[in-house]
């Protein structure tokens, strides 16, 4: 939805009238660490892969603003039109946090729609001490995050915020005679805010969680997960052969075990092997990933029932399977 709105805003809603013909070539920008759903959404919105730009990242795996500006300038020089910038807070592999303020400045300068993909990490916006990670988010055109990923809502539940709902209405509105009623106009008609004509009552799940647990309990659970991640980070730091590949922004750690007996050329296969060994044992579930060209193991601490004793057991399990 965000990219459909971005497409129409960039063309003064011209593609609604004329389809994909007769308009400048539009371009979408995101970091190389952006979720695969960004590419899928762009393709569904009518962009071709040649219209997608994957920007370099910093040493902390956030988008490199200088490289983004370079790509924006190159496209403008080639008579292409910058359409949308996607900010990731945080990225799937490492939970890296893009600089929203910097991206908002570029979006304003180049006339782009700014979409913030807060997916899992967006739940941490309920913590006052973590809100600095989203500085500038009030300047976004749209934001999405998934309460089913960390907040604890039953799957599936995604929240989509848009600055101006009229962009949704302009893109999605339909009003055939068989849908018209005497009450039209008295309240928002959500068939005009999205692709489906009808929708399930997903909001009930979120409402029920908020009523049952309340803000304080939800905040304390997220703080517990972050504290447990910090504890494990400290254990890893005290061992010479364990390494963190990325900063620990919230509750996700990307680790590599580098024993002296394993050659560098064999390290990726070794990493995948001990990750698969733990998963096969049923003692824990970890996720392999590739970060900066290196195979890593992702440890995401965020299940509802996960306590310190479980993380302590995980650490013992990791040591056992790499002994």
Task: State the predicted function of each range.
Residues 104, 108, 237, 278-279:
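Anion (oxyanion) recognition and catalysis
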Residues 3-169:
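Conserved PLP-enzyme active-site core in the AAT-like
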Residues 110, 288-323:
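PLP-dependent enzyme catalytic core of the Aspartate aminotransferase-like
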Residues 244-278:
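Conserved PLP-binding catalytic core of the aspartate aminotransferase-like
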Residues 91, 110, 135-240:
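Active-site C-terminal subdomain of aminotransferase-like
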């Amino acid at each position: 939805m965000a990219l459909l709105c971005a497409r129409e805003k960039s063309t003064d809603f011209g593609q609604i009238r004329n389809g994909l013909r007769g308009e400048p070539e539009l371009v979408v920008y995101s970091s190389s660490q952006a979720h695969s759903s960004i590419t899928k959404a762009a393709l569904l919105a009518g962009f071709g892969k040649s219209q997608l730009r994957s920007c370099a990242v910093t040493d902390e795996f956030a988008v490199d603003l200088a490289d983004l500006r370079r790509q924006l300038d190159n496209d403008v020089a080639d008579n292409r039109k910058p359409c949308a910038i996607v900010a990731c807070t945080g990225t799937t592999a490492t939970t890296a946090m893009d600089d929203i303020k910097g991206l908002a400045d570029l979006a304003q300068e180049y006339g782009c729609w700014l979409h913030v993909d807060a997916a899992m990490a967006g739940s941490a916006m309920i913590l006052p001490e973590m809100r600095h990670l989203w500085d500038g988010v009030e300047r976004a055109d749209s934001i999405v995050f998934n309460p089913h990923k960390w907040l604890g809502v039953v799957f599936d539940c995604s929240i989509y915020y848009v600055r101006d709902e009229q962009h949704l209405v302009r893109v999605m509105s339909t009003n055939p005679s068989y849908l018209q009623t005497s009450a039209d106009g008295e309240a928002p008609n959500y068939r005009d805010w999205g692709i489906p004509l009808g929708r399930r009552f997903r909001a009930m799940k979120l409402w029920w969680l908020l009523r049952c647990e309340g803000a304080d309990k939800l905040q304390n659970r997220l703080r517990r997960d972050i504290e447990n991640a910090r504890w494990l980070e400290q254990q890893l730091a005290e061992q010479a052969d364990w390494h963190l590949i990325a900063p620990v922004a919230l509750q996700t750690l990307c680790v590599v075990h580098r024993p002296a007996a394993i050659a560098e050329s064999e390290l990726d296969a070794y990493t995948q092997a001990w990750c698969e060994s733990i998963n096969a044992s049923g003692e824990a579930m970890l996720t392999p990933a590739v970060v900066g060209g290196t195979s890593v193991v992702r440890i995401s601490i965020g299940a509802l029932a996960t306590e310190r004793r479980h993380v302590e057991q995980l650490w013992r399990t990791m040591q056992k399977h790499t002994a």
